[in-house]
């Protein structure tokens, strides 16, 4: 594997000289890009805490997970093709189109009247978000030289990580405290603010992009124009990778959410179909004139390492986002609001980690050593998190999260920068998009793997802890509801289960009481006795569930720790490449040969 940027050997030559952005135009474009990324990344996690209220309003509990899955499917399938098309035809109008689609999807999601409508509109919203996520980091690479990119990629990485971390807290706050609007937003429909909040911010960003983002910021000079260029688009490759990814995500979602068993024909069949489609995609890419995902990029050691690290980073980050709040609320017994406040220091530490890494890289023009340090700090933090028990203090948990966040933050600064520095500018879109695609895929893989570990551990451990006779007294169905982790984090669900189980037991107990002069008193006495017995039994079941959940999440954190160990190994291959200080050679006109200095970094 080479550490130098791959040579193009391609009929398309280097990009035209871009108009450099300065002053108001530069500030406006950067602000718009940050707002776009913030909203589109935020919507990956902001809906989770609002889902109970949404399901309560729209019904359709059986489709609970699809509200999140639809967004992921829409976004991840768009990244590869849009990244490639932006290299061929420019970025501005793709970015504006994606932002518009995202805002339309947000408005429609907020106005949804049924769960099916919400799922469809979330998919539309995801399509727009996928376009934005694919292009925002790429446009930053267009604007700045690699030597300048370090601090800006750090800032944008912080925005992306901050959005993912703060999403659950913001979603919960909007659902509980969003403003009321007479006739439109009531106490039971405050959840609509989760989607409507995107509109004013997104419109400002859209206007700034329309006015200040140059159309020639990244357009490639090419001998192919018009329909000739369109005919070279790899539509079969785009269809194959989208289909393969959808099948993969569906299989992982079905298995990890226990919709179907991992060994079921449905899961095995769709995962096998995904594997077959990926094989066809890789074969197709070897012969495509303009491949959606040029496989030769992965022969570059630095680019391949950055892409794999993006996959691993999101596996770790998203799994922590999902399961740390569950531990804090379900095991340590704090509220959702307090849980969000406790995770805030982790968010701040990730910002500090990213900022420090950005400053160090900007000054040294090197990223290898700081990335190794970041991986070690992150691993130490996750190791400490994996030692938490039901008796762990909140302060201790917060300290452990701060350490993990500090290490994770380093990766927000490094990965896009390293990948972009390792490839020619004419491949900036498809290269950056590949890194983002693997990152999005990593988020799904991480949750699927850790979720399976947590669910399997919980199912086996709870059996050992249940009080004797619990299954007989509560019935299998009642026990299933009583051992659902939602019991520990949702007081309304817990009250419903207690009421239902008590009512069922009382009715069975009094069904055969013979009539007589003391009938009413007997019924009252039996009701009081059975109620006390059932509630005592349920309190024991809930405590057993709390202890089992602690063990299950601990095992899940050990799985995340394994991801961290792999990250350390891959980081060793992320070697330094001298960063370009200026674009003198890279701004050669279209007549420049494809193997010119455009492919070579300029040493600082």
Where does each model-flagged region fall?
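Helix-loop-helix hairpins in multi-pass membrane proteins, especially solute transporters
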Residues: 83-238, 348
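Membrane-embedded alpha-helical segments of multi-pass transporters/permeases
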Residues: 107-111, 206-211, 279-282, 383-386, ...
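Short, Lys/Arg-enriched, Gly/Pro-containing loop segments at transmembrane-helix junctions
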Residues: 218-224, 290-296, 463-465, 578-589
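Transmembrane-helix exit segments and adjacent C-terminal regions of multi-pass membrane proteins
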Residues: 1-29, 33, 208-218, 280-283, ...
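Interfacial helix-cap and linker-helix signal at transmembrane-aqueous boundaries
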Residues: 54-55, 85-86, 170-187, 252, ...
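Alpha-helical transmembrane segments of multi-pass secondary-active solute transporters
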Residues: 64-65, 94, 152, 194-197, ...
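Transmembrane core module of solute transporters
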Residues: 24-79, 83, 117, 233-236, ...
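Small-residue-rich alpha-helical segments with characteristic i,i+4
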Residues: 137, 153, 159-160, 176-179, ...
